[in-house]
A protein has these predicted regions:
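Short, Lys/Arg-rich, polar N-terminal cytosolic tail immediately upstream
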Residues: 1-9
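Transmembrane signal-anchor helices characteristic of membrane glycosylation enzymes that use polyprenol
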Residues: 8-34, 123-125
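Extracytoplasmic catalytic/substrate-binding loops of multi-pass membrane glycan-assembly enzymes
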Residues: 29-42, 48-54, 59-71, 81-82
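Short acidic/glycine- and proline-prone juxtamembrane loop motifs at membrane-interface regions
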Residues: 32, 132-137
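Loop-to-helix entry region of an early transmembrane alpha helix in multi-pass inner-membrane enzymes
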Residues: 58, 62, 66-70, 78-97, ...
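Hydrophobic transmembrane alpha-helices
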Residues: 72, 76-77, 99-107, 125
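Transmembrane-helix motifs of polytopic, lipid-linked glycan transferases
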Residues: 86-114
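Transmembrane and membrane-interface helices of multi-pass
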Residues: 96-98, 114-126, 131
Length: 139
């Protein structure tokens, strides 16, 4: 059992896929934080008017993280009105990559601890909320 887990946890790609699968059921709940709709509207206005603003072409920013607005605008350009699920999957994967980097710092020599840390960290309720409900915290 230990050798199987070591093989799985030593492969970063498989570990990130596992964390993405853990978060996948949350996408079917369609539970989105209401603040994310503000950011997504600002991103839509950036795509439509070239302005980071809430009310059309008016230059009043309503976003807290401009990087997330730019990423959301990119996803809206690529996927159109169906951008939400790919954006949330991307956010969850970025969070998993970040937790993997943190695990490599905390547990540089122990692959099992590193793997369990990444999987368990990505299962915590605040982590699920941060990376699967539309807010920029996953990024």
């Amino acid at each position: 059992m230990k050798s199987v887990l070591s093989k799985i946890f030593s492969n970063s790609f498989i570990l990130i896929i596992i964390t993405a699968i853990i978060k996948l059921p949350l996408l079917f709940t369609k539970n989105i934080q209401e603040d994310s709709f503000i950011t997504w509207r600002v991103a839509r206005n950036l795509v439509n008017y070239g302005v980071i603003g809430f009310n059309g072409d008016e230059r009043i920013s309503a976003s807290t993280t401009h990087l997330y607005v730019l990423i959301t605008a990119f996803f809206q350009l690529v996927f159109g009105e169906y951008f939400i699920v790919p954006l949330l999957v991307f956010s969850g994967i970025l969070f998993a990559v970040g937790s993997l980097w943190l695990a490599k710092i905390l547990f540089p020599d122990d692959i099992l601890k590193r793997g369990f840390f990444v999987v368990l960290l990505n299962m915590l309720p605040p982590t699920l909320t941060a990376s699967a409900l539309g807010m920029e915290y996953g990024i």
